[in-house]
C-alpha cells in the first residue's frame, strides 16, 4: 500500500542551500525511500527570485524523481505552509557589510514572525519545523513564539551541522570511521560559542576522551575548529557552506521522523528546564528520537569546564532572545 504523500514546505527555495537540499528531499533521503513528498516552495515575492525558483523546479522536474508527488511555487507564506507536515525554514536575511548583529536580529525577526504566524494559521497541527536560516536558534524562538496554537516542541533549530563537523574532527583525530563514533553531541547556540562535548563519546565501546586524552587539544584546537568552521569555508571558497548545511538538515529531519534507534544526536529544541537551561530557550541538547518525538538524554554530569562553556553559549542566546523580545508583541 503506497504511503500518503507528506507535504514539505521549504523557504528560501531558490537559494544556495536549497539547491543542494531539494533534490535530496525529492529523492527520499530525508523521509525515506518509500515516502512520497509534495514540495511547497516559498521565495520572496520579487520577480528575479520567483524566476530563479521556476528554474530550480524545471531541474527538479528533469530528475523525474519517483517519490515526487507534486511541487508548487509560492510567494505567500499562507499558501506555502498550507497543511505542511514538515517545514524547513532556510531563507533568512544574511548579514550585509556594516550590519550590526542587532540589525540582523531585527530583520530576521520580521521574517520569522510572519512565517510563524502563517504556520500557526494553516499548517498541520503535527508539523515538524526546522529552522536552518541564521541566527537559527533565535529565529526558531521567534517562529515558535509567533505560533501560540502549536506545541512549542514542534519548533527546532539546526545544530546538526556543528554535530557533524565535530564527528568528522574526532574521526580525523582518532583515525576511526565517522560511523563508529557514538554519544557525541553539541550544547547550545548554532554559533562559534557552541560546545561540542565528547566526554561521553565512544568508539567500539572505548572512551574517546581517554583515547585522545588531551585537554589542550580539546580547548585550543577541537572546539575552535568546529566553532569557526563556517568562517573557514567562506575564507576558502568565497561562499558559505551550503551543501553541508543541506546535508545536516536532511539528517536532522530524517532522525526526528524516522528515529535514532537509541543512538544520541543533537537538536536545537525548546528547553524543558533540563541541565539548568531556562524553559523555552531553544538550545542544543543531546537527544534520542522515537516515533517522531525527541527526548533529552538525562543524567549527564557537567564538569567545571563544560559548565563554563554552557554558560557562555547560554548567555549569548539569552542576549539574542532579549534583543528580539520587544518585536514579539
Swiss-Prot record:
Pfam families: Ldh_1_C, Ldh_1_N
EC nos: 1.1.1.37
Keywords, ordered alphabetically: NAD, Oxidoreductase, Tricarboxylic acid cycle
Annotated binding of substrate, by residue: 95, 101, 134, 165
Active site: residue positions: 190
Record: residues binding NAD(+): 12-18, 108, 115, 132-134
Catalytic activity: (S)-malate + NAD(+) = oxaloacetate + NADH + H(+)
EC class of the enzyme, as a word: oxidoreductase
UniProt keyword NAD, yes or no: yes
A single GO molecular function term of this UniProt record: L-malate dehydrogenase (NAD+) activity
GO BP field: malate metabolic process; tricarboxylic acid cycle
Domain of life of the native organism: Bacteria
InterPro entries documented for this protein: L-lactate/malate_DH, Lactate/malate_DH_C, Lactate/malate_DH_N, Lactate_DH/Glyco_Ohase_4_C, Malate_DH_type2, NAD(P)-bd_dom_sf
Protein's job: Catalyzes the reversible oxidation of malate to oxaloacetate.
Xref: PANTHER family: MALATE DEHYDROGENASE (PTHR23382)
Family of this protein: Belongs to the LDH/MDH superfamily. MDH type 2 family.
Subunit structure: Homodimer.
Protein's name in the database: Malate dehydrogenase
Organism: Aquaspirillum arcticum
Amino acid at each position: 500500500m503506497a504511503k500518503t504523500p507528506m507535504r514539505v514546505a521549504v523557504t528560501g527555495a531558490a537559494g544556495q542551500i536549497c539547491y543542494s537540499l531539494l533534490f535530496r528531499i525529492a529523492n527520499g533521503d530525508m523521509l525515506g525511500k518509500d515516502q512520497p513528498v509534495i514540495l511547497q516552495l516559498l521565495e520572496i515575492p520579487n520577480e528575479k527570485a520567483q524566476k530563479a525558483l521556476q528554474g530550480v523546479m524545471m531541474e527538479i522536474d528533469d530528475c523525474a524523481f519517483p517519490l515526487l508527488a507534486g511541487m508548487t511555487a509560492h510567494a505567500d507564506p499562507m499558501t506555502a505552509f498550507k497543511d505542511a507536515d514538515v517545514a524547513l525554514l532556510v531563507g533568512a536575511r544574511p548579514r550585509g557589510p556594516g550590519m550590526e548583529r542587532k540589525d540582523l536580529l531585527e530583520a530576521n525577526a520580521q521574517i520569522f514572525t510572519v512565517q510563524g504566524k502563517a504556520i500557526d494559521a494553516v499548517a498541520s497541527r503535527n508539523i515538524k519545523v526546522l529552522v536552518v536560516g541564521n541566527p537559527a536558534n533565535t529565529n526558531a524562538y521567534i517562529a515558535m513564539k509567533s505560533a501560540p496554537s502549536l506545541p512549542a516542541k514542534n519548533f527546532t533549530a539546526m545544530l546538526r551541522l556543528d554535530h557533524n563537523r565535530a564527528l568528522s574532527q574526532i574521526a580525523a583525530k582518532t583515525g576511526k570511521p565517522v560511523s563508529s563514533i557514538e554519544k557525541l553531541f553539541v550544547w547550545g547556540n548554532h554559533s562559534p560559542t557552541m560546545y561540542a562535548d565528547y566526554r561521553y563519546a565512544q568508539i567500539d565501546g572505548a572512551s574517546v576522551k581517554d583515547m585522545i586524552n588531551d585537554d589542550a587539544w580539546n580547548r585550543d584546537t577541537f572546539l575552535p575548529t568546529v566553532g569557526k568552521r563556517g568562517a573557514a569555508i567562506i575564507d576558502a571558497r568565497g561562499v558559505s557552506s551550503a551543501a553541508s548545511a543541506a546535508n545536516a538538515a536532511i539528517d536532522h529531519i530524517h532522525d526526528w521522523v524516522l528515529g535514532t534507534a537509541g543512538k544520541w544526536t543533537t537538536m536545537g529544541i525548546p528547553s524543558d528546564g533540563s541541565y539548568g537551561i531556562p524553559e523555552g530557550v531553544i538550545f542544543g541538547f543531546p537527544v534520542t528520537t522515537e516515533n517522531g518525538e525527541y527526548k533529552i538524554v538525562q543524567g549527564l554530569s557537567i564538569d567545571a569546564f563544560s559548565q563554563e562553556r554552557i554558560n557562555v553559549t547560554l548567555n549569548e542566546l539569552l542576549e539574542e532572545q532579549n534583543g528580539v523580545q520587544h518585536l514579539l508583541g
